Amino acid sequence: MTPSPLRLLLDTAALQHNWRTLAAMSGRAACGAAVKADGYGLGAREVATRLAEAGCRDFFVSNWREAEHLAPLGLQLSVLHGVRDEDMPAALAGFARPVLNTPEQVERWRVGGGRACDVMVDTGMNRLGLSVTDVEAGALDGLEIETLMSHLACAEEPVEMNRRQRDALAGLAGRTNARRMSLANSAGIALGPDYHFDLTRPGLALYGGVPRPDMGARLRQVVRPQAQVLQRRRVPAGDSLGYNATWRAPRDTEVAILNIGYADGYLRAFSDRGSIEWEGSTLPVIGRVSMDLIAVDASIAPGLREGDWVAIAFDLPGQSAASGLSQYELLTGLGARYDRLWS
Ligand SMILES: *Cc1c(COP(=O)(O)O)cnc(C)c1O
């Protein structure tokens, strides 16, 4: 197959380092991995295989399609969105556990004869999960539960809501048959031992995202997009460049045109905001990001030529600040056109 003119360099050692770091930060608790949304855009199978090799045992996906994709790996999978009627055949096949979220799902699982499951309890986020009141009233009595979990709404912020959510989950200890309890996502791990329970569930930080500045020094960048120069040109002073002529050359300007655009997840938010690296120089994106192309000011890189590969700046906290996109959006938006190359 023809090599793609776009590639993601994916760093196995950095991914495994990040998991080991989060596992160490999780103390006595086991450390799992959220690999939903195709492993946050990196490729769920490749990510899960490497994390399993590092010692990870608990993997979380969103739905049964995603679980089926990973089933051949033989890992312990949990499906965060629970079970619909149409999921029951897959759910009863036993290659993953549903995370039951509603009284209807609990009933469906009981009637269908399902065995071990996980359960999500809502402790204040008001997204998915049974209410604490329902659990206290016995909604889960008799159910074979592996993990009773909840999810933090604001783990990356120092707000009092974290403590309230933590206390609400802790209050259910012993109220069900659950073998384990779980609360913390990536940022929640940094909230300390009170938040670790028996199992943590990081996603973002595994992939090099930094949910809290104090975690930045300990995590390594995993994803490095690269694109190629399609054309180099000189834009005369006063000429415009790109769609809607939003950029105008203040002087004669050397420009390189690269084959990456918003169809590759490099969204228009990077117009006049993104940058690339080439042989130690940082070249700014100028003008509007197109579907398949961007332009950079190459004035300080006289040696940059048609066909050269360049690195798209993709340190997640920095590029999130530059673009206004979340680190999660930067990862999960990475499109299908990249060759994903694991080192
Ligand atoms: C996505 C998700 C996680 C992982 O969250 P990060 O912020 O990416 O670490 C953990 N638990 C649940 C329920 C999730 O949906």
Residue spans for each PLM region:
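Conserved PLP-enzyme active-site core in the AAT-like
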Residues: 25
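Active-site-proximal beta-alpha core segment in soluble small-molecule metabolic enzymes
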Residues: 2, 6-17, 29-171, 175-182, ...
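Active-site anion/phosphate-binding pocket segments in diverse small-molecule metabolic enzymes
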Residues: 2-19, 66, 83-85, 101-108, ...
